[in-house]
Amino acid sequence: MKFYFVEYFILFTYIIISFILACIISLLSYLLTTKKEDPEKTSAYECGFNPFDDTRTTFDVKFYLVAILFFNFCLEISFLFPWSIVLGNISYFGFVAIILFLFILTIGFIYEWKKGALNW
């Protein structure tokens, strides 16, 4: 078994030098910067306006529901892209499986709509 020691040594040396250089640059950046506490820098950014209220307030659950809905439909799209690519090569079972998948997602969306998750 032939080992390629020289090639791996060059790669290993490159990784070590890159890591050391990144650490040195980060350390120099930390040590050489001025650290001034400014209320403008530590406040929450609200589209260019001064913050109206404390940023540590409660967050409405409706936003979480919208985020979960977005995640579900994003996941659905991630399943539909590969299916659309191999559509001509799949069998009848694959076609029925994706139609069943879309049907279950549609039923879930209708259920969320009827429960009022999308009403603000």
From Swiss-Prot:
The chain crosses the membrane at residues 8-28, 63-83, 90-110. Its EC number is 7.1.1.2. It is found in: Mitochondrion membrane. Pfam families: Oxidored_q4. It catalyses: a ubiquinone + NADH + 5 H(+)(in) = a ubiquinol + NAD(+) + 4 H(+)(out). It comes from the Eukaryota. InterPro entries: NADH_UbQ/plastoQ_OxRdtase_su3, NDAH_ubi_oxred_su3_sf. GO terms for molecular function: NADH dehydrogenase (ubiquinone) activity. Keywords: Electron transport, Membrane, Mitochondrion, NAD, Respiratory chain, Translocase, Transmembrane, Transmembrane helix, Transport, Ubiquinone. GO terms for cellular component: mitochondrial membrane; NADH dehydrogenase complex. It is a multi-pass membrane protein. Its main location: mitochondrion. Belongs to the complex I subunit 3 family. Core subunit of the mitochondrial membrane respiratory chain NADH dehydrogenase (Complex I) that is believed to belong to the minimal assembly required for catalysis. Complex I functions in the transfer of electrons from NADH to the respiratory chain. The immediate electron acceptor for the enzyme is believed to be ubiquinone. This is NADH-ubiquinone oxidoreductase chain 3. It comes from Cyanidium caldarium.
